[in-house]
Amino acid sequence: MTCLALAVADDMLYGVLAGNSADNSAPQREIGYMTPRIFPVPAFAIAVGLSLSGTLRAELAELDRAIAAHRMGTLTVLTEPGQEVQVEQLQHEFWFGAAISSGPFGWQSNSSDTAKYKEVFLENFNAAVTENALKWHAMERHQGRVDYSIVDAILAWTAKNDIPLRGHNIFWGVPQFVPGWQKSLDDDTLRDTVKGRAITVARKYKGRFVEYDLNNEMMHANYYEDRLGPGITRQMADWVREGDPEAVLYLNDYDILTGNRLDNFVTHARGLLEQGVPIGGLGVQGHLHGDSFDPEALEHSLETLAGLGLPIRITEFNFPGQRSRYYRDKKLTLRDGEEESKAKAIVDYYRICFAQPAVKGILMWGFWEGANWIPASSLYRRDWTPTPAAHAYRRLVYRTWWTDWKGKSDDQGRCEVRAFYGRYRVTTEGQSEVVDLSSDAGAISVSFRQ
């Protein structure tokens, strides 16, 4: 008889939303034992948000089925019969990430908030993206004077803490973000300058960034194409690959998940692929909604994008979003009821994205009011106290979607645990092994038999 179990933490989200802050002890990258409940079928629906409209129960059940099918695999442990087995999740495979502000790694590195910023990041996120440090206009404000220091500092810190980092961005052709000194260059000099930037960045950081946004928001404006012709995007990619042949290049654009520019983006991506541009993934920003978001538009957009056959990252997520009153007036704060609505909406947004197998990660565009372009969208207030959204997020990621199982192997010395894809510590009878349960493999076996 096989010991088959689905381990789900015995914690309900709505205790948190009602004011219970017990989730501060939720596990992070290294965790202790947490008593699980054992369900014969997926039971995520009872533990997460309720803001989705329509036939709620059916919608939640469908999302849960998709999550169980696409985000979980089987971890088999082989021991002597009847031995105690513990399976502890250490890290998710899926990217639950955030943007890293330049300040704590540059001019604010000695600030009293810097240590707290890094600590809270590591407690909540397993992936990162440079918010501004890699942007050309930030690195080279004056021609020929390139400042690599902040990028270097961020890369050193993320590498030390085993945080995969995406590079945002190599180019940004929206005119207001093109370095002013470039606009007086003649076309030939501009082309040589673009080539130099691509090769230099890729060569200097070869193998250190997991992926790059090649040319940010091309669909909305493309100064370099306007100046240098439609073939420049392919050339940019080729030059980056000259510096780092393994570089993974993403598109990154906005107003797609709202549905407003979805068709345009699909056409844009297909056109670049037809030109031979080596697109490695689709970056879609997640902050063009307002005080609410349309779950049906989000689901439809993700399903449509999945049809392109490329991995998807939700690269810049804020809630409330850029079309909210909180973006227009940065001093506005959420009231109690609005805080709870925000928490529920974030849970729903993440659940929809997590249920779509083509989505490989979500990265918040700021998590602390002290370094967030939409302060009201932060998980943590200026004084570092957690918002209801922080409690809800941690409960979702580190309890509802977290596998921590303890039991005994059967009379054949076998135990199968359905577990979320990620890294695990498996322990039995004083022996321990760390293994990766990957979505590519779908299953892994760990043997402690002599």
Describe each region flagged by the PLM:
Residues F96-A98, N126-T130, L165-H168, V210, ...:
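Hydrophobic faces of well-ordered beta-strands that scaffold small-molecule active sites
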Residues P42-S51:
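Bacterial N-terminal signal peptides
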Residues S101-A115, E225-Y327:
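Noncatalytic carbohydrate-binding groove/subsite architecture in carbohydrate-active enzymes
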Residues A127-R141, I150-I256:
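Substrate-binding cleft and catalytic face of glycoside hydrolase catalytic domains
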Residues K116-F125, D152-P164, A202-K206, V240-G243, ...:
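Acidic (Asp/Glu)-rich catalytic clusters
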Residues L56-W107, W136-M139, S184, L228-G231, ...:
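Beta-strand-rich domain onsets/edges
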